[in-house]
Amino acid sequence: MAIPEKEIYPRTGDRQTIYLKPVITDPSITVGEYTMYNYNDFVHDPTDFQTNNVLYHYPVNGDRLTIGKFCSITCGAKFLFTSANHTMRSLSTYPFPIFYEEWGLDIRDVTKAWDKKGDIVIGNDVWIGYEAVIMAG
């Protein structure tokens, strides 16, 4: 089923500003009504937000991104999840567990490669500025 354009693009003729909620397909990402994203570099497609802006977000971790209603997210904002944080409690920062098959580890050991920081939760009516980096925890 196609989403009507007016539900994605709030302004006629503007393909750089979108409402995020209708373009998110990942069930671990929740976005409130009227939250908008603007990517004004005229190169990237703002509808690719969950691919280009939500980073190191792997299902094995079970972490979530929640963004409230009426938020304004500007060009280049990134959300970094747990997998971007290599563990500091090991002999090495090398992420051995992500190569679980090669090293004969159980897939459940993958999450031991990084320090668990938790979900990212953004409240209602929050402005996230140009190229901001929001980290888990």
What does each model-found stretch correspond to?
Residues 1-29, 96:
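Extended, small-residue-rich solenoid/repeat segments and analogous flexible loops
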Residues 1-7, 33-42:
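A generic short-segment signal for beta-strand/edge and adjacent turn/coil regions
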Residues 29, 36-136:
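Flexible, glycine/small-residue-enriched loop-and-beta-strand segment within the central core
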